[in-house]
Regions:
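Glycine- and acidic
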Residues: 22-31, 96, 128-135, 181-182
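Surface-exposed patches in mature extracellular/periplasmic domains of secreted proteins
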Residues: 57-58, 123-133, 161-166
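Conserved catalytic neighborhood of penicillin-recognizing serine enzymes
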Residues: 53-111, 160, 172-201
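Glycine-rich, acidic and aromatic/proline-enriched surface loops and short helix-turn segments
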Residues: 2-19, 49-53, 65, 83, ...
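Mid-domain, small-residue-enriched loop/turn segments at the edges of structured enzyme/sensor domains
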Residues: 72-76, 107-149
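A penicillin-recognizing enzyme superfamily signal
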Residues: 1-4, 12-13, 19-29, 39, ...
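Active-site SXXK
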Residues: 8, 33-60, 90, 150-154, ...
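Secondary-structure capping and boundary motifs in well-ordered enzyme cores
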Residues: 2-7, 31-39, 79-83, 87, ...
Length: 202
């Protein structure tokens, strides 16, 4: 899914590739999928930055900070741990231990509220936990349309535009009978969007 971040217009969407083989099949672009670590900038880093829980210069010790069934958790992929690490490096390398500690500095409830209310993500109450929000193991997942709209807030200086599949409907006389205005709101501070863009492109 490709979205114009300034208008919310969906300009391209691919649901499947190759020849059509049957009718009434699922549209993969709007169906929910597991999003994995791609959720971290949305539910963890931008949320924590915007709330002032961390700054881009905040450091955490890159190691498993909890025990889960007697085993160190979370684990990184690859299974390497490098000591004190800045947030930006955690974003760049998608480090699980840094994401978990950043989320815990913010709080699970605040992360969930930010993601659902500010970024329009259709999370469910069962997703209100450290593992789903920090590493993306969601109950039902998210669609590529939702993800495109949320990430577009970074490109649009922190302003969220709801995704629009059409702009207007006209009748046979060319008169507009339905106009899709969409919904726009400030999802985050402009400085938060700036820092996220810097970290995601470094």
């Amino acid at each position: 899914t490709i979205m114009d971040p300034y208008t919310g217009n969906i300009v391209a969407m691919v649901g499947a590739v190759g020849p059509k083989t049957q009718n009434l099949v699922d549209n993969y672009a709007v169906q929910k999928h597991q999003v994995g670590s791609s959720i971290k900038p949305l539910t963890v880093y931008s949320a924590a930055l915007d709330a002032g829980a961390v700054t881009p210069a905040t450091t955490f010790d890159n190691y498993p900070v909890h025990l889960l069934n007697g085993n160190p958790w979370p684990k990184n992929s690859p299974n390497t741990y490098t000591g004190w690490t800045m947030i930006g490096e955690g974003v760049r390398r998608s480090i699980n231990t840094i994401a978990v500690q950043t989320l815990e500095a913010l709080g699970v409830a605040d992360s969930y509220a930010y993601a659902t209310e500010k970024l329009g993500l259709s999370l469910v109450p069962e997703d209100m936990g450290v593992a789903p929000l920090a590493m993306g193991g969601l109950t039902y997942g998210l669609s590529t349309v939702e993800m495109a709209a949320a990430f577009s807030s970074f490109a649009n200086s922190g302003v969220y535009n709801s995704p629009k599949m059409y702009t207007e409907v006209r009748d046979s006389n060319g008169e507009v009978v339905l106009k899709n205005e969409g919904e726009t709101h400030a999802a985050m501070k402009e400085t938060t969007a700036y820092f996220m863009n810097q970290m995601l492109t470094s």
